[in-house]
Amino acid sequence: MARAKRVKRDSATNIYRTCKQAGTCPPDVINKVESTTIADKILQYGSAGVFFGGLGISTGKGTGGTTGYVPLGEGPSVRVGGTPTVIRPALVPDTIGPSDIIPVDTLNPVEPSTSSIVPLTESTGPDLLPGEVETIAEIHPGPSRPPTDTPVTSTTSGSSAVLEVAPEPTPPARVRVSRTQYHNPSFQIITESTPTLGESSLADHIVVTSGSGGQAIGGMTPELIELQDFPSRYSFEIEEPTPPRRTSTPMQRLQNVFRRRGGLTNRRLVQQVPVDNPLFLTQPSRLVRFQFDNPVFEEEVTQIFEQDLDTFNEPPDRDFLDVQSLGRPQYSETPAGYVRVSRAGQRRTIRTRSGAQIGSQVHFYRDLSSIDTEDPIELQLLGQHSGDATIVQGPVESTFVDINVDENPLSEISAYSDDLLLDEANEDFSGSQLVVGGRRSTSTYTVPHFETTRSSSYYVQDTKGYYVAYPEDRDVSKDIIYPNPDLPVVIIHTYDTSGDFYLHPSLTKRLKRKRKYL
């Protein structure tokens, strides 16, 4: 028997509307619509004994009471629709409009008998143009000079008169000289003196002179107390530690030993594979499989190599066989003090039927060679300083050469020999070949060499540009067989003195040798 499908009934509000008049409403619908459930009764009975005021705590929507919800730290809320408070300004605003009111004269009515010509009259309105501008200029006269008397000398001799006028004296000029000095902290002045030619002492003297005289400061009176020489600011010594440090911030040995015990150097858990190929430092993926180079890709991250299970690809390097992943480079220091570049790899050697791959962990590493330090070079300070200057005197550092005037070294015949112009190179033509004819249409023919009881060799004529190679030693006096003879080819031994000839064994008919095992 099939179970009837359950049909969802209508909402409680719609059911209450239709069944209330008929009196067939279910009890749960009546309680829900009329709010007579157990929860509603608890609230009704509880509200009779407890009063919460206007907090609005009930089964209805939360409104926060009559004042609404107010966030902490803020003032009362503003209700929408209220009349805002207008704040009047403290100053009385000025009215906008013309400042001066110009009166307009009224015109009398015009009669018909009045002339239509309007006489011109002067306007009595206010002048819109500005009036006269008063200019006030203050004149400050310069300092008045005292009057100078110019002497005039008059001389009279005879009939001519000579008038001598003395030049006007020049008034004294007022000159003002100012000087400004700025201090540069990046520039340091070296006050040490350098022994040069003409100086008799190394004392530091400061001489201040002017146009009328001078005064010497320092070095005049000897010191009567025992003094101590302080080293110059540029002379210092660097103490080398023993043993010398290889890094600027050396680490503790205990930490290095703790790091060596675990990680990639654990030989029990990780296979150690040294790599000699320099591609391991820049492009390690080329050691795992053949591929094209991508100049944009940087191989400084972990690389994963996917390989089909049904195919087997031989890697370029046998040490990277069955490598699935190759980690990023790690730099460390070996006990000998070298820099080591390491990469952690994972092999996938065994594959199960379910598709799982099992392999060992591999540590690929390469030790970089050391950089030998060169011998230190003694450097000197640039500038003028004392104690390290070098003075070279010309007469003392001269070189004297004793030259014999009797000999004439300019004679080329006596000084040099023609044997220096001879070429001492020995030319060796063993194994060379002589080519006769052009190289454009050359043909090569191989001539068989027949071994006979007598030592004799035969060659083809080489007069039409053919190239014949003779790998064995040959004698000049040999017989020549022409390519197109008029008669049948017959081999004649010229060294035979009997006067007869015989057919060469290579020209006879060969008989097949019967094998017993066939």
UniProtKB/Swiss-Prot annotation:
One Pfam family of this chain: Late_protein_L2
Asked if the record carries the keyword Transmembrane, the reply is: no
GO annotation, biological process: microtubule-dependent intracellular transport of viral material towards nucleus; symbiont entry into host cell; viral penetration into host nucleus
UniProt keywords, alphabetically: Capsid protein, Cytoplasmic inwards viral transport, Disulfide bond, DNA-binding, Host endosome, Host Golgi apparatus, Host nucleus, Host-virus interaction, Late protein, Microtubular inwards viral transport, Phosphoprotein, Viral penetration into host nucleus, Virion, Virus entry into host cell
Could you describe the post-translational modifications of this protein?
A: Highly phosphorylated.
**According to the UniProt entry, which residue ranges have a biased composition of type Low complexity?**
150-160
Cell compartments where the protein resides = Virion; Host nucleus; Host early endosome; Host Golgi apparatus
Q: What is its main location?
A: virion
Superkingdom assignment:
Viruses
A GO molecular function assigned to this protein is:
structural molecule activity
The listed location of motif Nuclear localization signal is 1-10, 509-517
What S-S linkages are listed for this chain? C19-C25
Could you confirm whether the keyword Nucleus appears in this record?
no
| Chain segments carrying region Disordered | 139-173
A cellular component term, taken from the record's GO annotations: host cell Golgi apparatus
Tell me which InterPro entries the record gives. Answer: Late_L2
Q: Which family does it belong to?
A: Belongs to the papillomaviridae L2 protein family.
> What job does the chain carry out?
Minor protein of the capsid that localizes along the inner surface of the virion, within the central cavities beneath the L1 pentamers. Plays a role in capsid stabilization through interaction with the major capsid protein L1. Once the virion enters the host cell, L2 escorts the genomic DNA into the nucleus by promoting escape from the endosomal compartments and traffic through the host Golgi network.
Report quaternary structure and partners.
Answer: Interacts with major capsid protein L1. Interacts with E2; this interaction inhibits E2 transcriptional activity but not the DNA replication function E2. Interacts with host GADD45GIP1. Interacts with host HSPA8; this interaction is required for L2 nuclear translocation. Interacts with host importins KPNB2 and KPNB3. Forms a complex with importin alpha2-beta1 heterodimers via interaction with the importin alpha2 adapter. Interacts with host DYNLT1; this interaction is essential for virus intracellular transport during entry.
The name under which this protein is listed is Minor capsid protein L2
Instruction: Give the organism the record lists.
Output: Human papillomavirus 20
In the UniProt record, the gene name given for this protein reads L2
